[in-house]
Amino acid sequence: IYGGLILNATINLYAYCTIEETNDNKIVINSYDVCCHKIYPLAKCLDIDGEASLVKGVYNRIMRDYGLDAKSFKITTYNDAPAGSGLGTSSTMVVCVLKAFVEWFSLPLGDYELSRLAYEIERKDLGLSGGRQDQYAAAFGGFNYMEFLQNDLVIVNPLKIKRWIIDELEASMILYFTGASRSSAAIIDEQKKNTSQGNSAAIEAMHRIKQSARDMK
């Protein structure tokens, strides 16, 4: 309703994905960070059953949108950051896996298209609640001022920040993993509920966040 503004910075924790084409008429998924190993018969659509859902969601969407012939392959993924750490691990992995398929099939997707498709896969195809900035942050990287406008329009403005400012910022921050994880979906659902019901305190808080992004820029 009101649009959004975000000043986003990425860090040097990464998601990794490799795809190896095989000839055994199987699809093998290895996700080492979540201890998942699955083998499926070759198919153009894989059932979303709670196992390796992010990889399956990307694969199903690529097959459907681009009408590609199914090929047997082995895909291996790993994430530096723990799942549920609040660092956008799921969205980053979707972008990473999607980029791997884009490279494999030589698909014409730039950073904007990649981000938008990753968002649609995660939020619409898989039904995972969340925001929109994580996919764009993972695809673009660096420091970005993002504008979320009407009609799903997103504008990413890369920021040129002096090295000494980045060094000072890094020296002033500590990232610590408590060992506990949480689902961001429940938090996002609560925020959406509050704003859709016209909760004035929640809406005012969102406006203050937007203003903070303007001020930081």
Put a short name on every predicted segment.
Residues 1, 6-67, 116-129, 135-217:
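C-terminal nucleotide
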Residues 13, 87-107:
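DPxDG-like acidic metal-binding loop motif
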Residues 59, 70-79:
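Flexible, acidic active-site loops/lids enriched in D/E/S/T/G that coordinate Mg2+ and/or position polar
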Residues 64-74, 101-117, 151:
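Phosphate-handling active-site elements
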Residues 74-78, 96, 108, 121, ...:
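Generic hydrophobic-segment detector
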Residues 81-85:
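Short pre-catalytic strand/loop immediately N-terminal to key active-site residues, enriched for Gly-Thr
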